[in-house]
């Protein structure tokens, strides 16, 4: 029995399912999860001391790669001065000013500790600001495990949502309308029916939790126009895309300004930190100046802020995102070419430093199309690559990530390995 297997067996005695977040359990792909003990650059080492080229990167935060020296040094320096204060610090002002300068739509920002906190708080804030209750979200988009957002579509286009998790009250789910991603006509229909009740539309500007789905031309602009027309708050959930697809996030890439933005992952540099921010008029509704309550013991934690500041400093280097996008395209185009050479039905797509792999003829545009991918083919590919030391997301429905530490050697090895595996199909 391998050390990974031993650890997983033992973990299941003390941790539900043996993991602290469900996707880590390999339920989607089968087999034993990898227990990591060390990371450096583009590589991670498991409990059996096997190395992997890592394309998960802790699900997106590690845009510089594992254990970047400047980030580690910043964390160490901050920790020496105290792990937490529960009081304001100069560093949290520094990162707030930086986020307001870099993100086009953010005039004020509030720091929190997780993406779920950020989206939950943004929803509450939108409801408080508009004095409305109904929310629109999109099938397959994940916005954390807040009750109001753990909702799946009903049986008809405009039926109220149903809980997608046990423990979520039907009454809570019923205030959320779930629509098809990239279907602007469906959103317009919802506004025609519920417009005066809709507090907010929340959307991943690039969907990354049903594999990767890019917005179709006009979709985000259409959401902006509809929210403006009906007085609803447009929320871009950029927990994943923020500083991953560009220095101005997805909103800068596509030229659309939301009213509120949620951030996470990259802004914490690998530490637990997130944020939500937007128009000053809306943010001023937050306590202590407004009536919408939000708080957190570890919000603005100085060690997490230090990691975030170090990371955001490095991604501002000219050419950083051009190089990252080029590396990611080299990976996806190379994988698609390798599959085509062997006659394997497969395609791939990239946006900035994130990518999707699909065992289907063309890149999906909706949740329904994602569900039509050949999951068995993906699972076989995943395990074959894992055996060769290439770690992709252990699910056919998750995006992957390239970091600045992934160089030509890592990409070339990945492509050569994939071609060998495609040849077995």
Swiss-Prot record:
Enzyme class: isomerase
KW Zinc (keyword) present: no
Keywords, sorted A to Z: Cytoplasm, Isomerase, Porphyrin biosynthesis, Pyridoxal phosphate
Cofactors demanded by this protein: pyridoxal 5'-phosphate
Main location: cytoplasm
Gene Ontology MF terms: glutamate-1-semialdehyde 2,1-aminomutase activity; pyridoxal phosphate binding; transaminase activity
Pathways per UniProt: Porphyrin-containing compound metabolism; protoporphyrin-IX biosynthesis; 5-aminolevulinate from L-glutamyl-tRNA(Glu): step 2/2
GO CC list: cytoplasm
Keyword Transmembrane on entry: no
E.C. no: 5.4.3.8
Domain of life: Bacteria
Catalytic activity from the UniProt record: (S)-4-amino-5-oxopentanoate = 5-aminolevulinate
Residues with the N6-(pyridoxal phosphate)lysine modification: 265
Cellular localization per UniProt: Cytoplasm
GO process terms (BP): protoporphyrinogen IX biosynthetic process
Family stated for the protein in its record: Belongs to the class-III pyridoxal-phosphate-dependent aminotransferase family. HemL subfamily.
NCBIfam families: hemL, PRK00062.1
Family matches, as PANTHER family: GLUTAMATE-1-SEMIALDEHYDE 2,1-AMINOMUTASE (PTHR43713), GLUTAMATE-1-SEMIALDEHYDE 2,1-AMINOMUTASE 1, CHLOROPLASTIC-RELATED (PTHR43713:SF3)
Oligomer status and interactors: Homodimer.
Protein name, per record: Glutamate-1-semialdehyde 2,1-aminomutase
């Amino acid at each position: 029995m391998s050390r990974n297997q031993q650890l997983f067996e033992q973990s299941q005695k003390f941790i539900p399912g043996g993991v602290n977040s469900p996707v880590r359990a390999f339920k989607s792909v089968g087999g034993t999860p990898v227990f990591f003990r060390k990371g450096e650059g583009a590589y991670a080492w498991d409990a059996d001391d096997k190395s992997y080229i890592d394309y998960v990167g802790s699900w997106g935060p590690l845009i510089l790669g594992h254990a970047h020296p400047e980030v580690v040094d910043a964390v160490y320096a901050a920790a020496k001065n105290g792990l937490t204060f529960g009081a304001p610090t100069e560093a949290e002002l520094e990162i707030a000013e930086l986020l307001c300068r870099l993100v086009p739509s953010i005039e004020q920002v509030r720091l929190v500790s997780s993406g779920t906190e950020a989206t939950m708080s943004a929803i509450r804030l939108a409801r408080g600001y508009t004095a409305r209750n109904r929310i629109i979200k999109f099938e397959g988009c994940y916005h954390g495990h807040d009750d109001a957002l753990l909702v799946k579509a009903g049986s008809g286009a405009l039926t109220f949502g149903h809980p997608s998790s046990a423990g979520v009250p039907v009454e809570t789910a019923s205030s959320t309308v779930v629509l098809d991603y990239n279907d602007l006509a469906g959103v317009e229909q919802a506004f025609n029916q519920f417009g005066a009740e809709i507090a907010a539309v929340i959307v991943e500007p690039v969907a990354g939790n049903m594999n990767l789905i890019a917005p179709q031309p006009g979709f985000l602009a259409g959401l902006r126009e509809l929210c403006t027309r009906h007085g609803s708050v447009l929320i871009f959930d950029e927990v994943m895309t923020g500083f991953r697809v560009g220095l101005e996030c997805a909103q800068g890439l596509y030229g659309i300004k939301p009213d509120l933005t949620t951030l996470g992952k990259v802004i914490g540099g690998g530490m637990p930190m997130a944020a939500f921010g937007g128009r000053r008029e809306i943010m001023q509704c937050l306590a202590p100046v407004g009536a919408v309550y939000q708080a957190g013991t570890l919000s603005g934690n100085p060690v997490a802020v230090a990691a975030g500041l170090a990371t955001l400093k490095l991604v501002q280097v000219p050419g950083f995102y051009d190089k990252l996008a080029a590396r990611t395209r080299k990976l996806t185009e190379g994988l698609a070419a390798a599959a085509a050479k062997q006659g394997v039905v497969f395609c791939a797509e990239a946006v900035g430093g994130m990518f999707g792999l699909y065992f289907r003829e063309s890149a999906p545009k909706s949740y329904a199309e994602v569900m039509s991918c050949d999951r068995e083919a993906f699972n076989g590919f995943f395990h074959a690559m894992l055996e060769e030391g290439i770690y992709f997301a252990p699910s056919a429905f998750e995006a992957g990530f390239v970091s600045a530490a992934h160089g030509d050697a890592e990409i070339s090895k990945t492509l050569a390995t994939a071609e060998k595996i495609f040849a077995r199909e």
